């Protein structure tokens, strides 16, 4: 979030509940954290920050054990605008937001990270803004501001089955 304290403790935008009190996670983030998700044993955070803890991490970072890590090397491979949603689907991290680039690729609001590299999927068009990603059973649902997804009419809500898009309800 945007919070910087809990009671008398300094907690910069990321906190954990230990069963009785809130505690900071290292030094927190230097700007807004919008979304958090678990992917395996790693805790991923997305937002509009440029560092988490002592790590440069433009818009996306993960916590493994007791340390923060950047995804894809931090600054040179960061996200160029806000991340609004994260989902772990088919052993990959999916990100949605207002961005147009991740790493060195064009990605109009939607991309995935396989642990080694970024890729796009489903042919999003410029102007696509993704606000929410949700995994249900074997499908990834995508909500946002768009009229088509992957060449099909899908006003603001679409379903990805791992290989193809369909309009919600189809």
Model-derived regions: residue spans:
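Extracytoplasmic surface signature
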Residues: 1-170
């Amino acid at each position: 979030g945007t919070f910087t304290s809990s009671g008398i403790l300094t907690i910069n935008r990321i906190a954990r509940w230990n069963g009785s009190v809130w505690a900071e996670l290292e030094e927190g983030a230097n700007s807004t954290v919008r979304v958090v998700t678990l992917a395996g044993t790693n805790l991923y955070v997305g937002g509009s920050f440029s560092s988490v803890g002592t790590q440069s991490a433009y818009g996306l970072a993960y916590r493994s054990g007791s340390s923060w890590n950047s995804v894809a090397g931090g600054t040179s491979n960061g996200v160029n605008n806000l991340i609004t949603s994260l989902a772990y689907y088919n052993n990959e991290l999916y990100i949605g937001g207002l961005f147009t680039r991740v790493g060195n690729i064009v990605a109009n609001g939607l991309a995935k990270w396989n642990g080694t590299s970024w890729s796009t999927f489903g042919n999003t068009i410029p102007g696509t803004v993704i606000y929410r990603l949700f995994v249900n059973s074997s499908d990834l649902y995508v909500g946002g501001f768009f009229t088509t997804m992957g060449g099909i009419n899908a006003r603001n809500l679409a379903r990805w089955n791992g290989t193809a898009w369909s309009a919600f309800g189809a």
